[in-house]
């Protein structure tokens, strides 16, 4: 055993460092988005990459539609997101198809005509189709209609302005609203209508001016009692690079004569420093009397190996004093699109894949938190990939430590030049002088290796006060014990033991600190 001590001792330290590195990788890739909020839980897959309707039943179950080639799958989940039932419908489906499903009644739109479940045409040449909770809106020939799912009759609601080809519906608790938006140059005009028995009643109208270089990309609105809020997402084209997006919000009330002002929003990154970038798929709603936005954005995450940036799901709450409070609702290295709120405690989104997209949810429901905490095969693979990437950093960090290693090597070479073969004799002062020179180099050039960025990235067990000096001295003691064992068991002379001491010490240190050097 003593003969093997010279490699067993440093090997134990290095293997322990690699194990801690892997454990840190597991911790990073499985980190919850925020306290008391679950990780993503996969509940299905779909072949399309856009909106999928969700219904919450009075009993607290969820009906989620997933799309496959020529097949609609309606899956029913309980409040713990355990699937309790499923039904499939054979209809032609692609990413343009929109479906109304209420109980067993199915009506769909193929971007041209509206059909019943048997494939019979109900309405031809319909430009737009809006499936809602218990009714359907559609646009045909510049007119907005309501389609009654029970008897398949159509009622004209309002004639839209020429050139207007889309509306934004909003299902309130008691009423159904829709918004029209018209943009001319940098003028944006918004009208809010309430659906009545006699058609549509305009309840609010306003206009905004945006920057002349910007164009409206998306709009949304929300109504709660008499409170009204608008969201505008604009894009400014750049002469070089990607277009820059901007988000604005305005708050007012129905019946108010005061013109609301657009407030530009910047979303702070709740998990990192600075702001979230490229917010998209933004929706606005009132949650517990407070205005809140749900969106996907690029923000900080430790689930990735190098960039520490990925698209995840976020909410932004706008307080009464105008403060913006962001919260992260997903934490994954994969791209997230089309986030959707199921209720106050659960959100859903698509995770893009090469052939199929995964449907995931996250929630504050304790049952979901527990269910989503299980490590998946993907978690293990991502943790292994991140660990191997960190090991690659260790190899590069070793190059930086040459500033330490070169000094004992130069000392040994110079002593051979001066003393020659006499150094092969057991000269204690030579060995200890070489060790002292190396240790002096580690302290003199301490800040070259132990940089501030390293401590910002490293875990807590490496960043306590004086940690770099404590680890340096502790590993020096281990290296010294292992080095001294070679004197009696392998008859190593002082030069070999000096070089071995420095090499073993460096390998042990970089196994712990190297992954966080850059």
Regions found by a protein language model. Name each.
Residues 2-518:
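Extracellular, repeat-based ectodomains that mediate carbohydrate processing or recognition
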